[in-house]
Amino acid sequence: MTIDNDDANPLAPADLPGIDATTEVSRVWGHIGAIIVDATLQRRQNYHTTVKPRVVALVAAWPDADTTSGFRRRLDTGKLSDVISWPSPGRLAQVEDITCVFERQGIETVVELQGTLGDPVKRSVLREALASVRHVSPKTLDYIDTLSGVSASAAFDVREHGE
């Protein structure tokens, strides 16, 4: 069946060949706190049973933590462990450290994070700062691209030409 207006309705990213919708689309967050928590918890954890439910709980409980300053206000209450049901101090310290990097880099919103990741110079500075956080590996850095909605191909182009 052909629709007269096919050109006006391009395929969504999840409809493109080779794109796994469960990986690429469902892991994009419009919430700084969600990006930080997801990136922190993903190491050696099952995404669907461990990470995603906790990030969804965070977004539901702390909708105002969608900015770095909003997330900071919530972090300072000391309740993150309860909100995401995560008692381990190591991961909670990593959340704190990544938040500090975002603050030092002046990244307040997901749009600003996307802009930073899309600029070769700023991207390099951010990745270097994040890499200094314990347990943030190159894989975690690339995963932050995914979580913020920066496509893998755009991130690759920046790495090839800018880093």
State where each predicted segment sits.
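Structure-specific DNA junction-binding interface
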Residues: 1-94
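Catalytic DNA-binding helix-loop module of base-excision-repair DNA glycosylases/AP lyases
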Residues: 40-41, 118-163
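Short helix-capping/linker segments at secondary-structure and domain boundaries
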Residues: 43-53, 102-110, 150
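Amphipathic alpha-helical interface surfaces
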Residues: 51-54, 91-94, 98, 126, ...
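Flexible domain-boundary/linker segments
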Residues: 58, 112, 158-161
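Alpha-helical ds-nucleic-acid-binding substructure associated with the helix-hairpin-helix region
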Residues: 60-134
